[in-house]
Amino acid sequence: MLVYLAEYLTQFYSGFNVFSYVTFRAILGLLTALIFSLWWGPKMIERLQMLQIGQVVRNDGPESHFSKRGTPTMGGILILAGVFISVLLWGDLASRYVWVVLFVLASFGLIGFIDDYRKVVRKDTKGLIAKWKYILQSLAALVIAFYLYASADLVGETQLVVPFFKDIMPQLGGFFIVLAYFTIVGSSNAVNLTDGLDGLAIMPTVMVAAAFALIAYLSGHVQFANYLHLPYLPGAGELVIVCTAIVGAGLGFLWFNTYPAQVFMGDVGSLALGAALGVIAVLVRQEILLVIMGGVFVMETVSVILQVGSYKLRGQRIFRMAPIHHHYELKGWPEPRVIVRFWIISLFLVLLGLATLKLR
């Protein structure tokens, strides 16, 4: 929004032209979201405590988690508010890239909010019924998938980028809708499954978002895109502001979510952030790269699938408990050790993913 004001003021003072640079606005976007989260965080935590909106803890979970019962949750609202304020201030609101991500954040955030509300306010431990949660997620994802496919007017917007192979970029056609759908819904639920320990989900989310900020910048710059054999996507640079806003809001939230957590993000945060990473990957045509960089999310999801499948087919469990972070807790690892080691794995995978941009 402020970019338009700066554009108008440029005629009076050329220094305002600096706001036309994506990198400058991205830095301001990160700082805005970070400062907002740090400033508003204590007030929100206090408000959640007053409303008695506390975490519901599974009785069959690790005993160390029983002490978390009652910790304020739904803190994802803080993250989403920081992202929205930052993007609306510093983003180019004429960009469809911006509005696509904001729609996904809002729609999946609303689904998560309903789920959290039923759990912590209505005291319904099941929350939103899984069937309805999946239906609502599917509707939101399909709306975006069909919109992106129908509005695609460049070849690169529906190509699939295959890491390590610069000359393999198949045209997806209608399969684009299927891939976009599963990427958005899958990423949303994967981050949700990962959000089981203090700070475990938010830090990998920040890392992946930071990596996508770089990729979006490169994809929106014709010379860099051609040099790295990426699809050139005019206007994709505006996604940099969205990604850095997620980074800033996420780091601000981590200040209060780090062990021992003062607040949890809840489904309102995890479902929305996961879906946002998914749709950003779709927009910059890096769905496969998301699997690599978001490997921690993939690992958590696969552990649940294997656990459920093994129990139903063989009557035996592979892990002591799923998702896999609980397995290591039950093996005796202290919670901070599990968290930091998963962060290290995430950092390695993000760097590996970025390396594939050149290793092709």
Curated annotation (Swiss-Prot):
GO molecular function list: metal ion binding; phospho-N-acetylmuramoyl-pentapeptide-transferase activity; UDP-N-acetylmuramoyl-L-alanyl-D-glutamyl-meso-2,6-diaminopimelyl-D-alanyl-D-alanine:undecaprenyl-phosphate transferase activity
Pathway per the UniProt entry: Cell wall biogenesis; peptidoglycan biosynthesis
Stretches that traverse the bilayer: 21-41, 74-94, 97-117, 135-155, 168-188, 199-219, 236-256, 263-283, 288-308, 338-358
InterPro entries: Glycosyl_transferase_4, PNAcMuramoyl-5peptid_Trfase, PNAcMuramoyl-5peptid_Trfase_CS
A UniProt-annotated Pfam family: MraY_sig1
GO cellular component: plasma membrane
Coiled coil regions, renumbered to chain: none
Taxonomic superkingdom: Bacteria
Sequence similarity: Belongs to the glycosyltransferase 4 family. MraY subfamily.
Protein name from the UniProt record: Phospho-N-acetylmuramoyl-pentapeptide-transferase
Gene source species: Shewanella sediminis (strain HAW-EB3)
Source organism phylogeny: Bacteria, Pseudomonadati, Pseudomonadota, Gammaproteobacteria, Alteromonadales
Gene name linked to the record: mraY
